[in-house]
């Protein structure tokens, strides 16, 4: 997927849902753990050298898996290439859990599933579609296969 570098840099300067200095090791063999400022903005995980304002890189948190590894560590891998893992080391187990939960909730797919779930729950209680007043109908983009209303 292609991105506009200036737009990504602008996004990286937006307020973060979470930010912390974490140990980070990239997916290349022989990669060493480095301290990085890691910043979660919408569904992007930006990582910076601790003394620089521009990101070194960014991970789009779509179609990815966040997995606990050893105590205080987790990894992110992508469905298309599960062997390519980014490893993160936190200062505590509590911080690790917070990051893992935030990263799992950051994807568009998670938000879409949540929208569908709550839309259906409200419809069950009220008998009305809560999005209808905004001109949003039963569009295919909100539907999941096998989901019952």
From Swiss-Prot:
GO CC, alphabetical: cytosol; early endosome; recycling endosome; trans-Golgi network
CDD domains in UniProt: PH_PLEKHJ1
Annotated ranges, domain PH: 15-108
InterPro entries according to UniProt: Boi1/Boi2-like, PH-like_dom_sf, PH_domain
An annotated GO BP: endosome organization
Tissue-by-tissue expression: Expressed in testis and liver.
Superkingdom of origin: Eukaryota
Record-linked PANTHER family: PLECKSTRIN HOMOLOGY DOMAIN-CONTAINING FAMILY J MEMBER 1, SESQUIPEDALIAN
Name this protein carries in UniProt: Pleckstrin homology domain-containing family J member 1
